[in-house]
């Protein structure tokens, strides 16, 4: 699933479409997580004037309307020319003045929706702060983790706590600060929380700089792969040696997600604070 760095990179790669007018819209398959709106043709004649990201949503601002785009598990956008070969799972084609924008999604868990009061309230307003914003700091995170008994990794992946810290980047951040992913979130000391916040920000910034992580088939709208996966120290490395102590990395499931960790560098402390 694309995480925050991949969505940010995708958004940036769509910038060539800014200030271009929509000439036509073709819906080849409306059946995504939620159906593509019947009135999506309203975009015709409007210019794309803004692209922003909130959590894993791309917010596309047109002259009269706004749209909310989510890549789901396997979605991607691609900038194409009209004569480029169509792929089986190209579900939406928006023809701009100079290029086509195609939405491709084999598993169809993504969404293409209008951004309106209903979707704003349902999908946006309940989200936690952006991890790279000044709103995400140690004091804030400590207040959200207080008395939580769930594992810290599960807490970090809760979009009500902080957005966009998915499996890859939570795994790497916890490895780098030596915290076991199953450690009860409420047990972390303030010093650990401070280090964790700094590391989350560093990891995400680095991943964005490297174009995200291409683990299976992710690429941005220009067809370019990311390279952060080449720097991974824990994620996807179960049964390999820890780069720090040469202990064999282990894997456990937390919240239905694989969590790789080093039992030596990330010991699980079982006693909770009084």
Swiss-Prot record:
FPG-type zinc finger span: 233-267
Needed co-factor(s): Zn(2+)
Molecular function via GO: 8-oxo-7,8-dihydroguanine DNA N-glycosylase activity; class I DNA-(apurinic or apyrimidinic site) endonuclease activity; damaged DNA binding; zinc ion binding
Keywords, ordered alphabetically: DNA damage, DNA repair, DNA-binding, Glycosidase, Hydrolase, Lyase, Metal-binding, Multifunctional enzyme, Zinc, Zinc-finger
InterPro entries: DNA_glyclase/AP_lyase_DNA-bd, Formamido-pyr_DNA_Glyclase, FPG_cat, MutM-like_N-ter, Ribosomal_uS13-like_H2TH, Znf_DNA_glyclase/AP_lyase, Znf_FPG/IleRS
Binding residues annotated for DNA, in chain numbering: 89, 107, 148
EC number: 3.2.2.23, 4.2.99.18
Active site: 2 (schiff-base intermediate with dna), 3 (proton donor), 56 (proton donor), 257 (proton donor)
CDD domains referenced in this protein's UniProt entry, alphabetically: EcFpg-like_N
UniProt-listed Pfam families: Fapy_DNA_glyco, H2TH, zf-FPG_IleRS
An annotated GO BP: base-excision repair
This protein's record includes keyword Lyase: yes
Domain of life: Bacteria
Catalytic activity, as annotated: Hydrolysis of DNA containing ring-opened 7-methylguanine residues, releasing 2,6-diamino-4-hydroxy-5-(N-methyl)formamidopyrimidine; 2'-deoxyribonucleotide-(2'-deoxyribose 5'-phosphate)-2'-deoxyribonucleotide-DNA = a 3'-end 2'-deoxyribonucleotide-(2,3-dehydro-2,3-deoxyribose 5'-phosphate)-DNA + a 5'-end 5'-phospho-2'-deoxyribonucleoside-DNA + H(+)
Free-text comment on the cofactor: Binds 1 zinc ion per subunit.
PANTHER family linked: FORMAMIDOPYRIMIDINE-DNA GLYCOSYLASE
The family this protein is said to belong to: Belongs to the FPG family.
Function as written in the Swiss-Prot or TrEMBL entry: Involved in base excision repair of DNA damaged by oxidation or by mutagenic agents. Acts as a DNA glycosylase that recognizes and removes damaged bases. Has a preference for oxidized purines, such as 7,8-dihydro-8-oxoguanine (8-oxoG). Has AP (apurinic/apyrimidinic) lyase activity and introduces nicks in the DNA strand. Cleaves the DNA backbone by beta-delta elimination to generate a single-strand break at the site of the removed base with both 3'- and 5'-phosphates.
Quaternary structure note: Monomer.
Protein name in the entry: Formamidopyrimidine-DNA glycosylase
Species this chain originates from: Acinetobacter baumannii (strain SDF)
Taxonomic lineage: Bacteria, Pseudomonadati, Pseudomonadota, Gammaproteobacteria, Moraxellales
């Amino acid at each position: 699933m694309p995480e925050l760095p991949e969505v940010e990179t995708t958004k940036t790669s769509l910038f060539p479409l800014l200030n271009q007018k929509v000439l036509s819209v073709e819906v080849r398959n409306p059946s995504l997580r939620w159906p593509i709106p019947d009135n999506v043709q309203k975009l015709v004649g409007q210019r794309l004037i803004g692209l922003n990201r909130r959590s894993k949503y791309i917010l596309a601002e047109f002259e009269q309307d706004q749209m909310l785009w989510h890549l789901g598990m396997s979605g991607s956008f691609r900038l194409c020319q009209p004569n480029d070969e169509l792929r089986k799972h190209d579900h939406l084609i928006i023809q701009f003045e100079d290029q086509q924008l195609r939405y491709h999604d084999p598993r169809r868990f993504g969404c293409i929706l209008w951004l309106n009061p209903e979707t704003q309230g349902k999908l946006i307003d309940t989200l936690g702060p952006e991890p790279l914003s000044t709103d995400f700091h140690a004091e804030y995170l400590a207040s959200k983790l207080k008395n939580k008994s769930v594992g810290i990794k599960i807490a970090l992946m809760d979009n009500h706590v902080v957005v966009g810290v998915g499996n890859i980047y939570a795994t790497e951040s916890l490895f780098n600060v030596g915290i076991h992913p199953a450690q009860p979130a409420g047990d972390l000391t303030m010093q650990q929380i401070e280090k964790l916040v700094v590391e989350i920000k560093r990891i995400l910034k680095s991943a964005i700089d490297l174009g995200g992580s291409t683990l299976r088939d992710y690429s941005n709208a220009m067809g370019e792969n990311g390279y952060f996966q080449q720097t991974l120290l824990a994620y996807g490395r179960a049964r390999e040696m820890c780069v720090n102590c040469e202990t064999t990395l282990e894997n456990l499931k937390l919240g239905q997600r694989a969590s790789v960790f080093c039992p030596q560098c990330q010991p699980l402390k079982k006693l909770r604070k009084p």
